[in-house]
From Swiss-Prot:
Organism for this UniProt entry: Oryza sativa subsp. japonica
A GO BP entry: carbohydrate metabolic process
UniProt name for this protein: Beta-glucosidase 30
Positions annotated with a glycan in the UniProt record: 63, 114, 363, 416-417
Family: Belongs to the glycosyl hydrolase 1 family.
């Protein structure tokens, strides 16, 4: 008996024990609506590698990760998982796990090396994504494509500050149109931006993500930036870029291609630290400043009232024409969820040291009276709290007119400090996804229009500021050889998604 077959048999026995004990009994893909989509996700910079190959130009992340000290252990995505060369092997793994869909992003500078049409379209990049899309479809899966996952072209960052300038809107729409034109005959699910909150707040408020801008009183390492204004300006230009791309797609491509388009928004769920009115207010402000910042404009046409009232002229305004274009600019919403926090009201910040982080006047923590809200994960900012996902989905139904939702990221990590046999035994990940899926199921039964669930992530990969320390994948990747190994969770997913 081969090693692979032996491991598969052992895992089948392990699953059998769980089912006999009633732990996961009768809970499978058939517990969900027939058209529910199950998948897993990735991102170009975190996976592809080949950062100077195939005609690709540099992005802000290529630049940022090469600055010593910016990333843990000075890791980078130069090679990453070498998905650029190994994607056929990896798509076969997805098929083995019975996935319905694969979520991935298109690297802007692999299509437009200097970010602009004036620099020419890179035919090698187009060919790569055509081949990837075709292979995903040939394996019976749905490509779920993100147009922008934080990798702004370095040329545009150098030319006019990237998303700090409204000039980015036209450049982004040009890039999006190349994607629609080249791939839209086969891609039926588009998302314009992944987690614009993270890009804006971490790249321009904290300075810990590319392009690494912040006020000096936030961090001496940034060198340049304004944490009180730049996150809001960048987010505003993202809204305008998103809306313009959606408008283009709807008028020029959607009538014939018959696809759908939306935005992926990340948020936490929040619980009052105590039952006071002040802390309940802190919960709402916390939601407004991370979730409402992006949901309110695309659903209601403007930023939340708390943001508008408290930020004053630091928050850009939409013109009536822009508001009309932004409002309703989605066919579905992608929601990324990882954790829940307690929220406690705090006094207004020092007016001389304003920053996005303090503007919501709420302190968020995973602990109350020394006890965590849920088990603390390897990355200590995350707490495993499955009911939070259900509450978030119900809140979205109430506040945002029950939109079509895909849970586009949900996952748990472990550290890169275990032996291979230990790394493959990830029962905590099985429990994590099973419980979160049960709460998604509860939300559906309560009328929330959830249409899909994507794990984060397909394979262990480059995790931004933490480099390769955190492992979120269903597949273990040996960092020296890049060989892929299936974790126990991948076999659980395979069985969970098996069709009768």
């Amino acid at each position: 008996m081969g090693i692979r077959m032996g491991r598969r048999l052992l895992f089948t026995l392990f699953l059998g024990a769980l089912f006999c004990n009633g732990v996961y009994a009768k809970f499978t893909r058939y517990s969900f609506p027939k058209d529910f989509i199950f998948g897993t996700g990735s991102a170009a910079y975190q996976y592809e590698g080949a950062y100077k190959e195939g005609g690709k130009g540099p992005s802000v992340w290529d630049n940022f990760t090469h600055i010593p000290g910016k990333i843990l252990n000075n890791d980078n995505g130069d090679v990453a998982n070498d998905f650029y060369h190994r994607y056929k092997e990896d798509v076969s793994l997805l098929k083995d796990m019975n996935m319905d869909a694969f979520r991935f992003s298109i690297a802007w500078t692999r299509i437009l090396p200097n970010g602009s049409l004036s620099g020419g379209i890179n035919k090698e990049g187009v060919a790569f994504y055509n081949s990837l899309i075709n292979d995903v479809i040939a394996k019976g899966m749905i490509p779920f494509v993100t147009i922008f996952h934080w990798d702004t072209p370095l040329a545009l960052e150098s030319k006019y500050g990237g998303f700090l300038s409204e000039d980015i809107v036209k450049e982004y729409v040009d890039f999006a149109e190349v994607c629609f034109r080249e791939f839209g005959d086969r891609v039926k699910y588009w998302t314009t931006f992944n987690e614009p909150f993270t890009y804006s707040a971490y790249g321009y408020g904290k300075g810990v993500f590319a392009p690494g801008r912040c006020s000096s009183y936030v961090s001496k390492s940034c060198g340049v930036g304004d944490s009180s204004r730049e996150p809001y300006l960048v987010a505003h230009h993202i809204h305008l870029s998103h809306a313009a791309a959606v408008q283009l797609y709807r008028t020029k491509y959607q009538p014939t291609q018959k696809g759908q388009i939306g935005m992926v928004v990340v948020t936490h769920w929040f619980v009052p630290y105590d039952n006071s009115d002040a802390d309940r207010g802190a919960v709402q402000r916390s939601l407004d400043f991370i979730y409402g910042w992006f949901m309110d404009p695309i659903v209601h046409g403007d930023y939340p009232g708390t943001m508008r009232g408290w930020l004053g002229n630091r928050l850009p305004e939409f013109t009536p024409e822009q508001s009309a274009m932004v409002k309703g600019s989605y066919d579905f919403i992608g929601v990324n969820y990882y954790t829940t926090y307690y929220a406690k009201s705090i006094p207004p910040p020092n007016s001389n040291e304003l920053s996005y982080d303090l503007d919501n006047r709420a302190n968020t923590t995973g602990f109350r009276n020394g006890k965590p809200i849920g088990p603390q994960e390897f990355t200590p900012i995350f707490f495993n709290y499955p009911p939070g996902l259900r509450e978030l989905l119900l809140y979205t139904k109430r506040r945002y007119n029950n939109p079509t939702i895909y849970v586009t990221e949900n996952g748990i990590d472990e550290g890169n400090n275990s032996t291979l046999p230990e790394a493959l035994k990830d029962g905590h990940r099985i429990e994590f996804h099973s419980k979160h899926l049960q709460f998604v199921n509860h939300a559906i039964k309560n009328g929330v229009n959830v249409k899909g669930y994507f794990t984060w992530t397909f394979m262990d990969c480059f995790e931004w500021g933490d480099g390769y320390l955190d492992r979120f994948g269903l597949i273990y990747v040996d960092r020296k050889t890049l060989k892929r190994y299936r974790k126990e969770s991948s076999y659980w997913i395979e069985d969970f998604l098996k069709r009768h």
